[in-house]
Amino acid sequence: MQRNNGEGRPEGMHRISRFLHGNPFKNNASPQDDSTTRTEVYEEGGVEDSAVDYDNASGNAAPRLTAAPNTHAQQANLQSGNTSITHETQSTSRGQEATTSPSLSASHEKPARPQTGEGSDNEDEDEDIDALIEDLYSQDQEEEQVEEEESPGPAGAAKVVPEELLETDPKYGLTESEVEERKKKYGLNQMKEEKTNNIKKFLSFFVGPIQFVMELAAALAAGLRDWVDFGVICALLLLNATVGFVQEYQAGSIVDELKKTMALKASVLRDGRVKEIEASEIVPGDILHLDEGTICPADGRLITKDCFLQVDQSAITGESLAVDKHQNDTMYSSSTVKRGEAFMVVTATADSTFVGRAASLVGAAGQSQGHFTEVLNGIGTILLVLVILTLLCIYTAAFYRSVRLAALLEYTLAITIIGVPVGLPAVVTTTMAVGAAYLAKKKAIVQKLSAIESLAGVEILCSDKTGTLTKNRLSLGEPYCVEGVSPDDLMLTACLASSRKKKGLDAIDKAFLKALRNYPKAKDQLSKYKVLDFHPFDPVSKKITAYVEAPDGQRITCVKGAPLWVFKTVQDDHEVPEAITDAYREQVNDMASRGFRSLGVARKADGKQWEILGIMPCSDPPRHDTARTIHEAIGLGLRIKMLTGDAVGIAKETARQLGMGTNVYNAERLGLSGGGDMPGSEVNDFVEAADGFAEVFPQHKYAVVDILQQRGYLVAMTGDGVNDAPSLKKADAGIAVEGASDAARSAADIVFLAPGLSAIIDALKTSRQIFHRMYAYVVYRIALSLHLEIFLGLWLIIRNQLLNLELIVFIAIFADVATLAIAYDNAPYAMKPVKWNLPRLWGLATIVGILLAIGTWIVNTTMIAQGQNRGIVQNFGVQDEVLFLQISLTENWLIFITRCSGPFWSSFPSWQLSGAVLVVDILATLFCIFGWFKGGHQTSIVAVIRIWMYSFGIFCLIAGVYYILSESSSFDRWMHGKHKERGTTRKLEDFVMQLQRTSTHHEAEGKVTS
């Protein structure tokens, strides 16, 4: 049950309103602030009963409107006056079924939507239901032909609409001239989207420490007229920029396609006639006609006297909590009318709507640089500093040797190329892009590549329940039948008390009709009954009532609804035996404690007493793969916390069925609304230890994410509504689930197109594989840079010699071209969350780089040894060619060491990586043998074989050292790479919580005073 504070809004909602810059309208502060919100309609006996609050606290039952014989009369009933409005085209009768009462709402969470991945059974069930309803619903159906008018005009910026412009004549509407004037002032009803400058976006990939060094190297190469080096460096820069730009552009295009779900048409009253126009043509002050199935195209205020609508606001809130709307209540853009009919005056369009303001807020927040980008920039900066230090040493030595300027520039270019991994951005971006493409095949759209790294390190997943953990599809359980009543009788009566109108069918009625396949006798009898009158759910009596005629002509009244209220109907008619009463109440309490939503069923034949038939439990069952997926997630070191709008009992029962922890609490205990007496540190402990929270509002989700992040966790958050956008933005990995609203998709890092938790866990495992590839490459590439920087720096300082500049460039090219294929490597996924442990990474890379430099130095020094058979390749090779081959082989093979979690033979590389390295090794060998470069000389095949053997020996030595260091806890401690225990500054947490409560208290007082 929603509790209201002094402002008439759900308690605690003032916090989320801060996220959305306050209330843009006069009436309701947010979609969840409507005073007629219903919760847990059917739950009694241990679970909260329904509470329906009216603005005027009249306590009267909702008005029931019977169908008008024609559209003119219908409009006359709907409008505040009795003057009829001329329709452009006469419509047929709407039938006898009333359409203004709310449906049976059973959940706080989002409404049922088509489930993918559940097999074809669900689709067959839907087709069966449609066929059944078509058969049952034999009344006249409405056919309206409307005229389409288009009046394009300039789109201006959205502005605040003066109240006098909203005083449109409800019987006539706006004139065409008034519409044109308002179009010029307020523009079209289209949300303004930030147009990305693709040129600026592309150029942004040329910015960064590593990119700056590459650009400096290209300038040096051009100055030295070394066009080969210049072309290679520019090609690497373009490769990196192109891959990154194309990937993000493709992700954005996919998301743009998902946004094409807005209302396209609208029925508007203009010049005294109701006509259908493009939704973009709506202007403030327009009178819109809303009926079942209408997607509200703008914000507005209901003006029909005594109107009563049931509105689905799941596109905004992400929850299917039924909302009842009355005269003067606010309708929000993108909400859907489920039942009822009314007229409204448009108060805001485009960016001035509630959804528009929320989207603007999310867009204004901007995108952070991303942790992975920071890591790469940090690595590039450190390597750049090392390059500068090395060059200072070389310049000092050159000063004493009077080295000419041209030679110094060559030294600078050489050290710059080998000291900073020019291909690092390209390889890493390619690796993530390939991973993102793979994730897209699994229905996970990565909106920014850095989200892959964030997802790999997630330790806690805050997941909603409906549609992610459960099917979001109500199903019926085993019924309880009063003695002497058969299940088929109970089912038949319950289905007779269900809507037969397909357009307004709610989840409860749909569940009953689906279940008919298990009750063949009831299904056969259902079509033989004639519905004389039908009254949808009454929020006061908490029942649905149907008056039917049996095949024998007998008239029967059928009801279903809240169990105790249905039972009270029978008790008011006659005394029920104590045994039946006790058994009935016991079943109600038992079902409520187990989290079922239960419905009582009763009937009364003419001239007879009311007869209680029994109780039908219904629930949203877990998805078939959820329990297994949760068990798998626990094995992956991932904790899952359930955040749901459902009642605590339902949440606990779902958690029990799924094998999750059952420490699920009411979100009010967080004390976010100014109440609560737990110190801040205890609240944080409470959140950290809890397995989930029930009856949550969006601000609770935001607070849970914030608290967990303060405790040092990487947190992922799932969401689907506009109000979830701040939480998705706050989380380290924001996940928009299948069916999410546009605002949620925009705020999320990853958009899932498939339902269920398994899709998220699959993406998490894939992200860890991608992270493993990136980590292996970064260690490899840093080691290579240090290898050549140490060797060439010492060689220049000690002997004033340098490897052929072309060979240095080819070494850099070969290293990066070969390892581009690491994006397709057979990488394992870690069994626990992975993070960048930079001290350990630098420690491993430095030791490996030193060992590589020592190996190359040994080859270099023995080549100048004097005497017979004293050197490794003495008398069989030329220095530059032999060094080029030895450096190329040992560096290329190093990737086979860093890519493995264990010994290098424990995991076989992919054929793409093996093939790329083999091709590069063959090219390096041919370069060495035939001297394919400027000033090159041929090398003996004997020298080549010896270098291959020597390089393999170096490879085995480094592999052993790398494995020992990787498995050594002492090395971890020595490098200070182990993450510290999460220390909690408890006094600070207490102070912050007290400050929040004081602020909330004063804010509430100020609003009450005003």
Curated annotation (Swiss-Prot):
The active site is at D464. GO terms for molecular function: ATP binding; ATP hydrolysis activity; metal ion binding; P-type proton-exporting transporter activity. GO terms for biological process: proton export across plasma membrane; proton transmembrane transport; regulation of intracellular pH. The chain crosses the membrane at residues 202-222, 227-246, 378-399, 411-433, 806-824, 841-860, 913-933, 947-963. Residues 1-126, 139-165 are annotated as: Disordered. Its EC number is 7.1.2.1. It is a multi-pass membrane protein. It catalyses: ATP + H2O + H(+)(in) = ADP + phosphate + 2 H(+)(out). In addition to transient phosphorylation of the active site Asp residue, this protein, but not the product of the pma1 locus, is phosphorylated efficiently in isolated plasma membrane. Keywords: ATP-binding, Cell membrane, Hydrogen ion transport, Ion transport, Magnesium, Membrane, Metal-binding, Nucleotide-binding, Phosphoprotein, Translocase, Transmembrane, Transmembrane helix, Transport. Mg(2+) binds at D720, D724. Residues 1-201, 247-377, 434-805, 861-912, 964-1010 are cytoplasmic. GO terms for cellular component: cell division site; cell tip; plasma membrane. SMART domains: Cation_ATPase_N. It is found in: Cell membrane. Residues 42-52, 140-151 have a biased composition (Acidic residues). Residues 223-226, 400-410, 825-840, 934-946 are extracellular. The keyword Oxidoreductase does not apply. The keyword Nuclease does not apply. Residues 25-34, 68-106 have a biased composition (Polar residues). Belongs to the cation transport ATPase (P-type) (TC 3.A.3) family. Type IIIA subfamily. The plasma membrane ATPase of plants and fungi is a hydrogen ion pump. The proton gradient it generates drives the active transport of nutrients by H(+)-symport. The resulting external acidification and/or internal alkinization may mediate growth responses. This is Plasma membrane ATPase 2. The lineage of its organism: Eukaryota, Fungi, Dikarya, Ascomycota, Taphrinomycotina. The gene is pma2.
